[in-house]
């Protein structure tokens, strides 16, 4: 029951009305019996500093940060974890003993969660897209000891920047989506990860299209694991297509839940968080 003593955790971004985080986080908080609630708060760019400073003064125990503030929030934090610095993005904060914001990023741990039980050491991978999500995916693939990463994108400038950030850590190459070499790479890939928004229910993209078009996927075969970070609709057009090819498929729901569970553990100083409760809450909602 919410009382005058109840504290809160907030999601800050713009927009936030589509977020599923309140569903899964409040299910976990209720299960754990904590006097906390989780709310979503829309926040414009020009209000970010004011909102962040104001939340220090009231009963806010932690924050999730989403688009478009994941990079802008750096200047408002007193402590930043190595992984957040590496990714140049923050998604989780809590107030430290000095009433200042300590920050981290839980996206990498979220991404690798459904892959941990698979033997992927020294395997070959393809990442589709070169935006912010691709950074977390590439770092996760490095942590899982993949041998090579090929990043395919439409945007040469963001692709070049992404490759430059990781080229000293792993064998990585960037290709534009119309490069003829992609056909062979897809045929040989052990894992393909889609970080583009193509197929997402709430985007302007047509629902039944595949990232980079049907021809791009003609060499896909059943030995490849296909992981789509999109979780709505379930399954996505890409995962429907891949399942028909006999591929193992993974959607983005487990990543969403796992990164959320890691955030909740961060806010509660290492409390064991019920993944299954959060996952079931989202499945029931969707």
From Swiss-Prot:
Pathway linked to the protein: Metabolic intermediate biosynthesis; chorismate biosynthesis; chorismate from D-erythrose 4-phosphate and phosphoenolpyruvate: step 4/7
Lineage start: Bacteria, Bacillati, Cyanobacteriota, Cyanophyceae, Synechococcales
Self-association state and partner proteins as the record states: Homodimer.
Ligand binding (shikimate): 19-21, 66, 91, 107, 231
Gene3D superfamilies cross-referenced by the UniProt entry: Leucine Dehydrogenase, chain A, domain 1, NAD(P)-binding Rossmann-like Domain
EC class of the enzyme, as a word: oxidoreductase
Function: Involved in the biosynthesis of the chorismate, which leads to the biosynthesis of aromatic amino acids. Catalyzes the reversible NADPH linked reduction of 3-dehydroshikimate (DHSA) to yield shikimate (SA).
Active site: 70
Protein's UniProt name: Shikimate dehydrogenase (NADP(+))
Keyword field contains Lipoprotein: no
Substrates-to-products reaction catalysed: shikimate + NADP(+) = 3-dehydroshikimate + NADPH + H(+)
The EC number(s) this enzyme carries: 1.1.1.25
GO terms of biological process kind: amino acid biosynthetic process; aromatic amino acid family biosynthetic process; chorismate biosynthetic process; shikimate metabolic process
Organism: Prochlorococcus marinus (strain MIT 9312)
A matching Pfam family: Shikimate_dh_N
